Amino acid sequence: NIYVYKFNRYQLEYTAADDYTKLYGVSALEETFCWTNSEITELACGLYPTDYELTIDLAFEMPLGAYQDNNNQVTVYLNGKDIGARTISGENNGQALHFYVNEEDVIDGRNILTIRSELWDVSLIGNDESRILGIPLESVHFAPV
């Protein structure tokens, strides 16, 4: 297989709708979002060295009842470095996830953002689909701080 990716040296905002081809580990685009369908999802992003607030926007609330503990742990890495974990629970379901990125973890130019999340079986919510999904990813934003 040959994969072709368009890469912008510096780009701070990524949406599933506009940057779908830069994402790995996601299902087909559904309007403005895509489900992660692998425990590991990656996004190639163009950053310049500085500190950032990273925001991951979810498209909507998730069916937390499909998870064993009624929550989903999301861990984020930049270039292999763990930058934090957040738990999606009933209190924050559907809300954006926020992380702090240190300048020393940023490479000038191409960086790999990795999102690790638990998967759930769609059939557990009474649906006759056989898909295994993670989080409904809508957008990723890097805001310099």
Regions found by a protein language model. Name each.
Residues N1-V145:
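C-terminal luminal/periplasmic domains and tails of membrane-associated envelope-modifying transferases
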